[in-house]
């Protein structure tokens, strides 16, 4: 965590390592994705999948979910203790799609969790390789971020649907560790904290006893993670207040919602990583690529390069647009659900449209959907340029207090202007500046009011040609000033339901 004074790169968090130099980081991240690839190849063999079936993203997701479920200690324990009808706690499985006589068939597969764990460990030199599991969780989370809207969840916790750009990682499981915490948006953590405080208000024993002590530690840890995402002293000071509160209640909820709103202009630092489906790593390993020897980074050219050379397929429903399905998966692969569409379009080399205009539903197929009419098509996941992923909120003034980009949480470190309507945002801050955090609130509002829309974020940063792996010649794009592109405008996506 940033506040503990140990700044580790997110590759280190992802691979659970202590401080390492760049080469060691690249090697350990390479070992992690190589392990995922080896596991995937072995699973395809077990399931007797053809080459084409193994490249189907829906099969990849089923296999990924099986291994995540096999290692979900908490849920496994819960299932053992609360046996439910028709669920074998020792087994895991899902839909596998096969091509038969020119048609796609769905087949439900079941495996012993023990067997899956054995295959996973074997692919990872006998280790549990938690980092690889977290990597898969982040890929699923990025896919959810691009596919679903969280309006209902926002409204339930008293937040505003306009804060959707703060919700990165909102579907990540609790057990996703430091790497998971790094990619969570400000709104996601605020929401977790508010849920906690609400439970404490409704349940007298929530903070009491031995369990309550553990709860309290978790609460303070989450507060520290959130504090570490804020870049201004006033925002951090309010987080200290929230963390030290003896008996967190409505005042703290108020403070947290205020902070979430302020993060629309004073953006927090949220990490972005390109996590790809397991089948992509599998394809590379199968073609003889040695990830550990070559090294790999989640935030540089490597994922772009991997996607340039991978052919992945997807099932397509009758009235879906394959190009739109490709856009959805491309955004998920680069963790770009919250990026400015102008920037994404430039990097991808084809226009990226807002979600409200996509003719495609989610990637996963529900068990009651008719397979008769299913077709499949190639996903176009290639890009025109590549760019470095960022973990800053894109605040302009030396990355400190200033205008970040509204309704956007930047993914790529690429210069852009900040077209935003400050009046709209400031309207959310009328009135309430009293209470014990009043001076900090006033300070935050003052900073937000002085934010200038003509400022530029990531000054001088550009994209790179795919041949420029050392990032020597940045190409700084120029964007149309007037329209900022949020992916969520005119949103009609489905809600995320567990």
Curated annotation (Swiss-Prot):
GO terms for biological process: symbiont entry into host cell; viral penetration into host nucleus. It comes from the Viruses. The keyword Cell inner membrane does not apply. GO terms for molecular function: RNA binding; structural molecule activity. Residues 1-21, 79-98 are annotated as: Disordered. The keyword ATP-binding does not apply. Keywords: Capsid protein, Helical capsid protein, Host nucleus, Host-virus interaction, Ribonucleoprotein, RNA-binding, Viral nucleoprotein, Viral penetration into host nucleus, Virion, Virus entry into host cell. This is Nucleoprotein. The lineage of its organism: Viruses, Riboviria, Orthornavirae, Negarnaviricota, Polyploviricotina. The gene is NP.
């Amino acid at each position: 965590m940033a506040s503990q004074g140990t700044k580790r790169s997110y590759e280190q968090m992802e691979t659970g390592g202590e401080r390492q130099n760049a080469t060691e980081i690249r090697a350990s991240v390479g070992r992690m994705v190589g392990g995922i690839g080896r596991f995937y190849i072995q699973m395809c063999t077990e399931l007797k999948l053809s080459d084409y079936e193994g490249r189907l993203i829906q099969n990849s997701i089923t296999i990924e979910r099986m291994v995540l479920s096999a290692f979900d200690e908490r849920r496994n324990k819960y299932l053992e203790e609360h046996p439910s009808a028709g669920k074998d706690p020792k087994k895991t499985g899902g839909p596998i799609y096969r091509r038969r006589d020119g048609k796609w068939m769905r087949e439900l597969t079941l495996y012993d969790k023990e067997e899956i764990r054995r295959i996973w460990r074997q692919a990872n030199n006998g280790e549990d390789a938690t980092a690889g599991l977290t990597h898969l969780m982040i890929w699923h989370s990025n896919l959810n971020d691009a596919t679903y809207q969280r309006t209902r969840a926002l409204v339930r916790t008293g937040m505003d649907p306009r804060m959707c750009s703060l919700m990165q990682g909102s579907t990540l499981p609790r057990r996703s560790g430091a790497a998971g915490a790094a990619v969570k948006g400000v709104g996601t953590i605020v929401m977790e904290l508010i849920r906690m405080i609400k439970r404490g208000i409704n349940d007298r024993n929530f903070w009491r006893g031995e369990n309550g002590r553990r709860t309290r530690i978790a609460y303070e840890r989450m507060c520290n993670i959130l504090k570490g995402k804020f870049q201004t002293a006033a925002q951090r000071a309010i987080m200290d207040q929230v963390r030290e509160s003896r008996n967190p209640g409505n005042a703290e909820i108020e403070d947290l919602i205020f902070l979430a709103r302020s993060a629309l202009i004073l953006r927090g630092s949220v990490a972005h990583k390109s996590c790809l489906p397991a089948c992509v790593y599998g394809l590379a390993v199968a073609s003889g690529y040695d990830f550990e020897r070559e090294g790999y980074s989640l935030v540089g050219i490597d994922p772009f390069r991997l996607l340039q050379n991978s052919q992945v397929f997807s099932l397509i429903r009758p009235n879906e647009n394959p190009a739109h399905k490709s856009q959805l998966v491309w955004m998920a692969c680069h963790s770009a659900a919250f990026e400015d569409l102008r920037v994404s379009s430039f990097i991808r080399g084809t226009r990226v449209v807002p979600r409200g205009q996509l003719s495609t539903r989610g990637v996963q197929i529900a068990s009651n959907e008719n397979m008769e009419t299913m077709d499949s098509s190639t996903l176009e996941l290639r890009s025109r340029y590549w760019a470095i992923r960022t973990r800053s909120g894109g605040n302009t003034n030396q990355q400190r207090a200033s205008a970040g980009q509204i309704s956007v949480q930047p993914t790529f470190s690429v210069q852009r202007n900040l077209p935003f309507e400050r009046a709209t945002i400031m309207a959310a801050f009328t009135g309430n500046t009293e209470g014990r955090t009043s001076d900090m609130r006033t300070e935050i509002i003052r900073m937000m009011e002085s934010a200038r829309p003509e400022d530029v974020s990531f000054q001088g940063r550009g994209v790179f040609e795919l041949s420029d792996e050392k990032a020597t010649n940045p190409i700084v794009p120029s964007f149309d000033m007037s329209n900022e592109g949020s992916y969520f405008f005119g949103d009609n996506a489905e809600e995320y339901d567990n």
